[in-house]
């Protein structure tokens, strides 16, 4: 395929997605290349709706096939929170540390076995035709009592993956891309592209 727009200006996210799909497209853009689009209002009622909003708005503006993702961190003992508000759990215009600190405070005193959680990533694709679709990736884990590691972004330092025995923030990018919620969703996205376009 010729080109695609990743409907995000988050450098970490764009890099993670580009790493896995670069061989499928001759040119990959991000919202950094279309700054005039501005911030896309994510007012859906689910991560699926928010992802489709981003990919549709981006396609409508660029007329280039667009892919977007939205991710929720769902903590069982918090009834699925932060959920839809994962990126702004501690408020608007906050840092990753602000969000993690609020989460750790909310779970203060909760034993490890009750700190189960999952990352859920939904990726949507819009090309203006009949090929719009979505895929989902889920990574199960636990919320640590304190931050571990300095790699990655978002909640990675507090998300522990039992199968690997480490937090996402202590994994190399290769390992993380292989097992992460976004990595799983991107692999499903690539499979769907293969089916639709015989890439």
Show which residues each predicted segment covers.
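Anionic-ligand binding patches
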Residues: 2-5, 11-199
């Amino acid at each position: 395929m010729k080109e695609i727009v990743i409907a995000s200006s988050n450098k970490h996210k764009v890099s993670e997605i580009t790493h896995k799909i670069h061989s499928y497209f001759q040119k990959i853009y991000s919202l950094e290349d279309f700054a005039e689009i501005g911030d896309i209002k994510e007012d859906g009622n689910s991560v699926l709706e928010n992802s489709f909003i981003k990919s549709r708005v981006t396609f409508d503006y660029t007329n280039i096939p667009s892919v977007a993702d939205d991710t929720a961190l769902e903590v069982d003992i918090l009834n699925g929170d932060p959920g839809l508000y994962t990126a702004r759990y501690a408020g608007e215009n906050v840092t990753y540390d602000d969000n993690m600190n609020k989460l750790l405070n909310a779970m203060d005193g909760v034993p490890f076995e009750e700190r189960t959680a999952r990352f859920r990533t939904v990726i949507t694709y819009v090309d203006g035709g009949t090929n719009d679709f979505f895929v989902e990736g889920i990574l199960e884990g636990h919320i640590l009592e304190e931050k571990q590691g300095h790699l990655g972004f978002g909640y990675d330092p507090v998300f522990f993956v039992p199968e690997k025995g480490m937090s996402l923030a202590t994994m190399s990018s290769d390992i993380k891309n292989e097992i992460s919620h976004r990595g799983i969703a991107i692999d499903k996205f690539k499979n769907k592209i293969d089916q639709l376009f015989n890439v």
